[in-house]
Each structure stands twice: as C-alpha cells, then as structure tokens.
Amino acid sequence: MALRAVAGTAAPLLGEPLPVELMNTVWADRDGLHDELRDAAGLAAWLQAVAGRFAAGAEGGGPGLAVALPGGRPGRELAGQFRELRDGLRGLAAAVTADPRARAAGTGTPDVAAAVRAVNAACARAPLWSRLTWASPPGAPARTLRSAGTGPEAALSWIAEAAVLMFTGPDAGQLRACPGPGCVLYFIRAHPRREWCSAVCGNRARVARHYQRHRPGANWPGPDTPGSQD
C-alpha cells in the first residue's frame, strides 16, 4: 500500500479506518517528527482530505454521517480536542500492541485511564443519533447519523465512536505498530502477510537487512533513528 498525502494534507493516508488515520497524523521522516494537527489549518486540511470517508458505506458498511464535512472551519479549541483524541488513541494503540518503538514514545497519552477519558470526552462532544430514511421502491431503508454539532465537531465524535468499536471489536487484535526503520505509524493487519504500514517501510527494511548482511558491523540506522517516511 503506497504512502501518500491527499488533497493538501501533509499527513499520510493509508486507507486505514479513520481512527487509525487520525493516529497517523503524527508521522516521521528524515527531518524528524511531524504533527498535522499542530494548528487549526492542519486539521482543516486533514478533514477536507478524509471528508468523503464519512459517507454511507465508506467505513466498512457503517452508517454515514449526515452532516456536511468539513462544514465550518475548526478553531484552535477544536484542534486541541482532536489532538487530545489522537494522543489518547495512540496511547491505547501502544498499550494494545505493546509498542516497543522508542521513537513513538511520547507521541501518545501514556496513561491508559487518561487516554480512555479523552476518547469518551470526544464521543460526548457532539453526540450522534440515528435517522431512518425509507425510499420508495426500488429504494431500500437506510440509516444515517445526525448531529447537532458543526461538521468538524460531529467528525470528532464520529471518529471517537468508531475508535470505541475498533478497540472493542476484532480489529483490536489486528492493530499493529509498524516495525519499519524510524516509523511511528499504526495499521490494521487486514492480510496475514502484511508486515508494514506501507510499501515504503517494507522496502526500507529490506534495504536495511541487505546492507547489514553485506556490511557486517556497519552502523545502519535502526528502527528508532530518523528516516521513516520520505
């Protein structure tokens, strides 16, 4: 799976469930760690890039969010709430995966109880409710989600709700911390042969192993040195 940025966001989007994509708004490259949610502009760019994912069926056949996204511009306060949710999710992911990556340390909420509080607070930010639509034949009944919040507020709660389902469902057992050199990303191991978050990390790891085999004792960058994503 190729590593890419979409529609103006600098953050990598790997086609993962949205809670994982949110976790991956912290990423690393040869210049160090980056945070797409460092300000409201970065959050707005990321929401624009993933807006289509909130449509009906876009997330594993789940209900769509009937609030236009990115409807409304997120402000500094909401950007902070997205960071709190993201850091909470990264903290829980680190606990679930027993994440050994030193470079990823400090990119998530280290205390599980605090991380859970962050997720629950985000769920309550703009509560969602179901709405039934019943189209005339040949249509079919459909469920959408509504919210009284703005688009960005509803997106925050939607992602938090999706994270609750992820951590309490089968995907939790497939959540992985990418072992690529210097990588700090997470992914869902949807295929038993998948080892890396992206082909970029897989290729880098293979090059590292090849180099080590042919240059015994060489000081090749390890998994916690700069240089994960280009």
Language model features with spans:
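Cysteine-rich micro-motifs
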Residues: 192-202
